[in-house]
């Protein structure tokens, strides 16, 4: 936007360099940097606002540059002169007091909005501490923007291409670069690592919470165990399994359910016959784990406990309710543990 003022207004206006524009952010695109800002600098056309400072960045280490910039929080822009490193060479000198800048690849062309012309070149560089032989890579990065020069004729068309050879010969004995190569815009920034460290959380067993079904109150409900815990518990109780007897069972409770509650200390919510009589499932509704007893194992447990006629110890109540099909649901047993 161009501001036009009459003489009276201009006398009462602060200097442009002293004006701070609240909310202003400088985020130019690559095309805007080379086609507007860099081109105006090469043509010696100044701007009313000093958005990009003129600094020889190779006289400073990158961590000292942010305080020299006109603005910027994470990116800083500078007009930088491109001095030759060697005579008869267009390669600039990129050595600083504490290290050096090293290119990470070749120049990338920047095209006009209509994508028909190459209007600039972009190079990425990374800063290394120390000297070239033993340099240590840092997180400081730079994007260098420059206009195409006569030596970059393959990137763009030059009206004076026939004079290219003569122009280069005239500059072979000088460290001064052609006007297009004399200045570059350098964007300085520090690369941040987005990888966040993740804490290693140790895995632990979480005991399930038994919901209140509003049908019965439990003062001391035994904890449901996972199948692995049940099998481990079985191995410690093998010497306490009672000898089988021939007396008929006097309880409607299934032998396997009694074995689970008394021999293993397991409180289970659902005893399910799968419809074929092949297996009895003891399901832990809190975790989804299950202890599956095969038909042979079920018969074995029936033989072990089927003849018991005495009162079942440590059992207060048992409510049985028949459901459709071959399913039988039994409420959890309450113990005096």
UniProtKB/Swiss-Prot annotation:
Signal peptide (residue range): none
Gene3D superfamilies xrefs: NAC domain
Record Pfam families: NAM
PANTHER family xref list: NAC DOMAIN-CONTAINING PROTEIN 94-RELATED (PTHR31744:SF56), PROTEIN CUP-SHAPED COTYLEDON 2-RELATED (PTHR31744)
Chief subcellular location: nucleus
Gene: ANAC094
Gene Ontology, cellular component aspect: nucleus
Any GO molecular function: DNA-binding transcription factor activity
Cell compartments where the protein resides: Nucleus
Annotated domain remarks: The NAC domain includes a DNA-binding domain and a dimerization domain.
SUPFAM superfamilies: NAC domain
InterPro entries: NAC-dom, NAC_dom_sf
Residue ranges occupied by any NAC domain in the UniProt entry: 20-191
Name of this chain's protein: Putative NAC domain-containing protein 94
Species annotation: Arabidopsis thaliana (Mouse-ear cress)
Organism superkingdom: Eukaryota
Keywords: DNA-binding, Nucleus, Transcription, Transcription regulation
């Amino acid at each position: 936007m161009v501001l036009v003022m009459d003489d009276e207004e201009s006398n009462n206006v602060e200097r442009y360099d002293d004006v701070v524009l609240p909310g202003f952010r400088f985020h130019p695109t690559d095309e805007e940097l080379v086609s507007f800002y860099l081109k105006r600098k090469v043509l010696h056309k100044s701007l009313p606002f000093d958005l990009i400072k003129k600094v020889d960045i190779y006289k400073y280490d990158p961590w000292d540059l942010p305080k020299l910039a006109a603005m910027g929080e994470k990116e800083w822009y500078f007009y930088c002169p491109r001095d030759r490193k060697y005579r008869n060479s267009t390669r600039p000198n990129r050595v600083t007091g504490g290290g050096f800048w090293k290119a990470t690849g070749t120049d990338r062309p920047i095209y006009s909005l209509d994508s028909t012309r190459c209007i600039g070149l972009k190079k990425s560089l990374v800063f290394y501490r120390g000297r070239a032989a033993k340099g240590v890579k840092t997180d400081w990065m730079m994007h260098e923007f420059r206009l195409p020069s006569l030596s970059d004729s393959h990137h763009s068309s030059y009206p004076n291409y026939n004079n290219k050879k003569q122009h280069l010969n005239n500059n072979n004995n000088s460290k001064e670069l052609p006007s297009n190569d004399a200045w570059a815009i350098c964007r300085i920034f520090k690369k941040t690592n987005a990888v966040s460290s993740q804490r290693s959380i140790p895995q632990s067993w979480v005991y399930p919470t038994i919901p209140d079904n509003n049908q019965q109150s439990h003062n001391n409900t035994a904890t449901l165990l996972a199948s692995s815990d049940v099998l481990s518990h079985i191995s410690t109780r093998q010497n306490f399994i009672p000898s089988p007897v021939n007396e008929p069972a006097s309880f409607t409770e299934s032998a396997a359910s009694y074995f689970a509650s008394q021999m293993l200390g397991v409180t289970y919510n659902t005893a399910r016959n799968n419809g074929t009589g092949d297996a009895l499932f003891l399901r832990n509704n809190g975790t989804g784990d299950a202890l599956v007893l095969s038909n042979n194992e079920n018969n074995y447990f029936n033989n072990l406990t089927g003849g018991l006629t005495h009162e079942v110890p440590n059992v207060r109540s048992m409510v049985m309710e028949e459901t459709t099909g071959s399913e039988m649901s039994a409420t959890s047993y309450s113990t005096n543990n």
